[in-house]
Amino acid sequence: MNVKQVKVTEVGPRDGFQSEKTVLKTEDKVDIINHLIKAGFQRIEVSSFVSPKAIPQLADAATILENVKRNSNATLAALVPNAKGALRAVDAKLDEIVVFLSASESHNKKNVNRSVKESLTGFKEIADIAGKNNIPVQGDIATAFGCPFEGNVPAKKLAEISNEYKLMGFKGV
């Protein structure tokens, strides 16, 4: 794989909002994201289309996308854990879907209660939904530089996951 360009994604909205003990008002989230867009961020992970029961702080993902002042210079992305989330993301007119797994089996199991293979299998359905709706998919790999449970992750494992992403037609890793 020849890397031609590295793009940095601002994940503060999604990662930060989900970490708050209290649920922030949707209009406050929209305001923060609008300021990030205005500041020139080109790729922003605005939320996640996860079950509202799992992470109530992100239950308003679709409403955020309805109200953000979109800018052609900013790609609005969100984490999508499953096909149901992918369908919600399509309905919300998300610019880009992000899927993720952990390179280490133990971390992936603790994080999403799936093996790496099970996660990859689920991503195929998400990729199909995204493809039918012309939405690009980005594949993220957690614990790529080390796992708190297993230590170093072999480079071969990262290459295998990256190759699976490529075979599914993902736009990047």
State where each predicted segment sits.
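Conserved, mostly hydrophobic/aromatic
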Residues: 16, 36, 89, 97, ...
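Conserved N-terminal beta1-alpha1 strand-loop-helix module at the mouth
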Residues: 2-49, 57-63, 67-73
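Active-site mouth loops of central-metabolism enzymes
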Residues: 11-28, 74-83, 110-116, 143-156
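Glycine-rich, proline-tolerant flexible connector loops at the mouths of alpha/beta enzymes
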Residues: 42-67, 100-114, 143-150
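Alpha-helix-loop-beta-strand connector modules within alpha/beta enzyme cores
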Residues: 54-78, 117-139, 160-164
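N-terminal small/glycine-rich loop or linker at the start of catalytic domains
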Residues: 1-21, 98-111, 132-149
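Short, well-ordered coil/turn segments that N-cap beta-strands
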Residues: 4-6, 40-42, 70-76, 94-95, ...
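Catalytic cores of alpha/beta
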Residues: 82-93
